[in-house]
Structure formats: C-alpha cells, structure tokens
Amino acid sequence: MVSRKAVAALLVVHVAAMLASQTEAFVPIFTYGELQRMQEKERNKGQKKSLSVWQRSGEEGPVDPAEPIREEENEMIKLTAPLEIGMRMNSRQLEKYPATLEGLLSEMLPQHAAK
C-alpha cells in the first residue's frame, strides 16, 4: 500500500504541472546575474579567439577578425534534418489573438503554395 505522504506529494506535483501548462506567464530560466556572467564569458571567449587569430598570423601584425582565415573559408554548416518551427495554442489563446493569427496564416499560405 502506498503511503499518504507519497500520494500527497504526487498530487501536489500533478497540480503544479497542470497549472504550469495552463499559464501564459513568462518564467525566467536564468536570473539577471547569471545572464550577465554568461555574457561576460562570451565576451572573454571572443577576445581569446581574436588573440589566437592574431598569434596564428605570426609577424604579419593584427588581423581583421572580419576576414576569414584560410582554414575557416572552407567550413560550411550543413543541417542534417529539416528544421520546422511550430507552437501550440489552446482555445483561449486562439480566441485572444485572432487578428495576429490571420496575419501569420495569410503570410505563410502564399509561401507554401509557391513551393
């Protein structure tokens, strides 16, 4: 037999999941401080990369980071699977944004018909 505490915990988790699926509010994944730290890491990574480009150029002096290096010229990113973007909306959301949805559909339908 299952204990009452386990049933109560599962019930609380279920109710929280139902509320989370019905809410339209934005819940931030990262705090503001975490975002700042991640942006700082990205800036530092970019500075390190530009330094390594300069070191690879040898005695030629600083290289413009916008110029591709011979090794990087031949690199190409290829998608291995088709990419599809979609969204789910419940009936309340559909009733709330009819004009926007009509505009999006009118833009997308001619594009698909042309293909």
Swiss-Prot record:
<dbReference type="GO" id="GO:0005576">
    <property type="term" value="C:extracellular region"/>
</dbReference>
<keyword id="KW-0372">Hormone</keyword>
<protein>
    <recommendedName>
        <fullName>Promotilin</fullName>
    </recommendedName>
</protein>
<keyword id="KW-0732">Signal</keyword>
<dbReference type="Pfam" id="PF04643">
    <property type="entry name" value="Motilin_assoc"/>
</dbReference>
<comment type="function">
    <text>Plays an important role in the regulation of interdigestive gastrointestinal motility and indirectly causes rhythmic contraction of duodenal and colonic smooth muscle.</text>
</comment>
<dbReference type="InterPro" id="IPR006738">
    <property type="entry name" value="Motilin_ghrelin"/>
</dbReference>
<comment type="similarity">
    <text>Belongs to the motilin family.</text>
</comment>
<feature type="region of interest" description="Disordered">
    <location>
        <begin position="39"/>
        <end position="72"/>
    </location>
</feature>
<dbReference type="InterPro" id="IPR015662">
    <property type="entry name" value="Promotilin"/>
</dbReference>
<dbReference type="InterPro" id="IPR006737">
    <property type="entry name" value="Motilin_assoc"/>
</dbReference>
<dbReference type="GO" id="GO:0031788">
    <property type="term" value="F:motilin receptor binding"/>
</dbReference>
<keyword id="KW-0964">Secreted</keyword>
<feature type="signal peptide">
    <location>
        <begin position="1"/>
        <end position="25"/>
    </location>
</feature>
<keyword id="KW-0165">Cleavage on pair of basic residues</keyword>
<dbReference type="GO" id="GO:0005179">
    <property type="term" value="F:hormone activity"/>
</dbReference>
<dbReference type="Pfam" id="PF04644">
    <property type="entry name" value="Motilin_ghrelin"/>
</dbReference>
